[in-house]
């Protein structure tokens, strides 16, 4: 039993850093893409929030500050509870 727990602990310690790096890399990707996407938005903080949510789920952000949603169908097809586009 002790050997099993020790093995599980070692595996967890080896895997955890790689998962953290992957998450951080995804976040920096989304942060930079959303910063560009929301650079001309009137409500930049709201734009950045929803762009970040959509980017994390879809793994892409359309180019430019407006439109071009055909480049990322997942981003384009996300809707809020009112049926409007969730992603800026």
UniProtKB/Swiss-Prot annotation:
UniProt keyword annotation of Electron transport present: no
GO biological process: defense response
One Gene Ontology CC term in the entry: extracellular region
Pfam families: GASA
Matches recorded under PANTHER family: EXTENSIN, PROLINE-RICH PROTEIN (PTHR23201), SNAKIN-1 (PTHR23201:SF143)
Expression across tissues: Expressed in tubers, stems, axillary and young floral buds, sepals, petals, stamens and carpels, but not in roots, stolons, shoot apex meristem or young leaves.
Positions of disulphide bridges: none
Upregulating conditions: No responses to methyl jasmonate, ethylene, abscisic acid, salicylic acid, isonicotinic acid, indolacetic acid, gibberellic acid and infection with incompatible bacterial or compatible fungual pathogens.
InterPro entries: GASA
Top-rank taxon: Eukaryota
Family: Belongs to the GASA family.
Function per UniProt: Has an antimicrobial activity. Causes a rapid aggregation of both Gram-positive and Gram-negative bacteria, but the antimicrobial activity is not correlated with the capacity to aggregate bacteria.
Record's subcellular location: Secreted, Cell wall
Post-translational modification: Six disulfide bonds may be present.
Keywords per UniProt: Antimicrobial, Cell wall, Disulfide bond, Plant defense, Secreted, Signal
Protein name: Snakin-1
Organism of this sequence: Solanum tuberosum
């Amino acid at each position: 039993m002790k050997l099993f727990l020790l093995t599980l602990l070692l595996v967890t310690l080896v895997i955890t850093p790689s998962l953290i790096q992957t998450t951080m890399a995804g976040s920096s990707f989304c942060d930079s893409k959303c910063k560009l996407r929301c650079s001309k938005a009137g409500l930049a903080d709201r734009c950045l929030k929803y762009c970040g949510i959509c980017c994390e789920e879809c793994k892409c952000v359309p180019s430019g500050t407006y439109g071009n949603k055909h480049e990322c169908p997942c981003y384009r097809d996300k809707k809020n509870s009112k049926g409007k586009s969730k992603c800026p």
